Each structure stands twice: as C-alpha cells, then as structure tokens.
Amino acid sequence: PSPPGFSPFR
C-alpha cells in the first residue's frame, strides 16, 4: 500500500 502521508489526490 501507499506509505503514510502519501496522497494520490492531493
């Protein structure tokens, strides 16, 4: 999964 703090849709 995506790392913490990462937003694919900022």
UniProtKB/Swiss-Prot annotation:
Modified residues (Arginine amide): R10
Entry annotated with the keyword Secreted: yes
GO molecular function: toxin activity
Keywords from the named record: Amidation, G-protein coupled receptor impairing toxin, Secreted, Toxin
GO cellular component: extracellular region
Keyword Secreted: yes
Major localization class: secreted
Compartmental location: Secreted
More info: Has been extracted from the spider web.
Recorded family membership: Belongs to the bradykinin-related peptide family.
Record's function text: Causes constriction on isolated rat ileum preparations and relaxation on rat duodenum muscle preparations at amounts higher than bradykinin. Is a partial agonist bradykinin receptor B2 (BDKRB2). Has insecticidal properties. May be related to the predation of insects by the spider webs.
Protein name per UniProt: Nephilakinin-3
Organism of this sequence: Trichonephila clavipes (Golden silk orbweaver)
